[in-house]
Regions:
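Short, structured helix-loop boundary elements
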Residues: 30, 72-79, 181, 185, ...
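Short strand->helix junction
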Residues: 22-23, 57, 135, 177
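Short, charged, surface-exposed hinge/linker loops at domain edges
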Residues: 207-216
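Glycine- (often His-adjacent) and acidic-residue-rich active-site loop
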Residues: 5, 31-32, 52-88, 104, ...
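Crotonase-fold acyl-CoA enzyme core
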Residues: 88-203, 226-230, 234-235, 239-243, ...
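Conserved CoA-thioester-binding segment of acyl-CoA-metabolizing enzymes
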Residues: 1-54, 87, 91
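Terminal peptide-recognition signature
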Residues: 15, 33, 51, 63, ...
Length: 256
């Protein structure tokens, strides 16, 4: 089974994540998404991208199953490779509309916020749950989330790790269109087509102006996020956060 289903709808490239039910990501999945964005950038006939997912969740976060790096240095290098692929998505030149169903949790929320626009439903759940894991936000969220909803509301979501349902997400500005679960993808496609109907040169020029310096700022902040995640990953609190999440209970954190 492929990790992505790629198709075309007129001038829209459809990038469907295909790791159901929860579409956890890793470096390889991000590489494939970035490659698809590169294809769009090189093809003048593609004017926008629709990023969606097959399954219950849009993306419920990073994949922690399977063999993990054994040493702190290896874990840091592994995270560096992952973020390098994520940065490639931010560098894409064509607009991305994300159809966000189910959960967009942790790094999965970061993937959703890498898009230019998000379409969600009342049942969609966003959560930057990093502090609930004894961890630090990643995937450039310390840039993208405050940019969307302001620094105070972003701090509230980061420091509490609270879950935000679709209607509140719409009020906050986390999503741009609120649709029913049944019409979510169709509404996202409608927006992607609307963008594709505009002048490609005008869209490219305007988007570049609006995003001036954004990728460079995300790259700088990713380095900070990686530094913080690297030392926090070695703490007892992080181990407790992972256990508590797996056991569906509150963490008993000891600040060590």
């Amino acid at each position: 089974m492929s990790d992505l289903n790629i198709s075309r709808d007129g001038h829209v490239q459809v990038i469907e994540i295909n790791r159901p039910p929860h579409n956890y990501f890793d470096t390889e999945l991000l590489r494939q998404i970035a490659d698809a964005c590169d294809v769009a950038d090189a093809d003048a006939d593609i004017r926008s991208n629709l990023l969606c997912a097959n399954g219950k969740s849009f993306c419920a976060g990073a994949n922690f199953t399977g063999k993990q790096p054994e040493t702190p240095a290896e874990r840091r290098a592994d995270s560096r490779r992952l973020y390098d692929q994520g940065l490639r998505i931010f560098r894409g030149k064509k607009p991305i509309v994300a159809a966000v169903q189910g959960n967009a949790i942790g790094g999965g929320m970061g993937v959703a916020l890498a898009a230019d626009f998000r379409v969600a439903s009342p049942e969609t759940t966003f959560s930057a749950n990093f502090t609930k894991l004894g961890f630090h936000p990643g995937f450039g969220l310390t840039v993208t989330l405050p940019n969307l909803i302001g620094p105070t509301k972003a701090s509230l979501l980061f420091l509490t790790g609270r879950r935000v349902k679709g209607e509140e997400a719409y009020r906050l500005g986390l999503c741009d269109v609120l649709a029913t679960t049944e019409t979510l993808r169709a509404e996202a496609m409608k927006l992607a087509r609307e963008i594709a109907e505009s002048s490609p040169l005008g869209v490219k020029s305007t988007r570049e102006t609006l995003r001036l310096g954004l990728v460079e700022r995300i790259e700088e902040q990713l380095n900070r996020e990686l530094d913080e995640q690297s030392w926090l990953r070695e703490t007892e609190d992080f181990a407790e956060g992972i256990r508590a999440t797996a056991e569906r209970r509150a963490g008993n954190f000891m600040a060590r």
